[in-house]
């Protein structure tokens, strides 16, 4: 059975998920942790539960879903995995900070570790996540779907009580 721990992060209340099962393997989805206490809460949760994080998954390349990638890389050696259509966004996270948030950040983001392939499935523990392309919010937006549990991680493709925004492409 999946265990899903949600962390609300940064000034936009972005959702980061640590998804684990009984094997203690876990994946981190959309680590948008900006503030030090958010970063600490996520890493403490993973280490405190003796989890073995094996993937840092990204639904899309907007900064609010990637603020904390450097922390995950430093703590666990994981590089972000993303759709290639969002490569440009991922390589320009500092620019997003300046243009969207009017802030200058000196974060050194880890390089992209893997681009998703068409039809790829992410395996961890006793579970798997299908990668479903859902372009619209960004060209490379994806949804991670666990069919066995009936759970989807949609990033900003869907908002609570609404559809996601599609005007950022």
Residue ranges and their predicted role:
Residues 19, 30, 60, 72, ...:
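Divalent metal-coordination and catalytic microenvironments
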Residues 1-49, 143-155:
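Conserved beta-strand hairpin/beta-sheet module of binuclear metal-dependent hydrolase folds
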Residues 33-34, 96-97, 121, 127-169:
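Metallo-beta-lactamase
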Residues 7-8, 111-113, 133-135:
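Short Gly/Pro-enriched turn/cap motifs at secondary-structure boundaries
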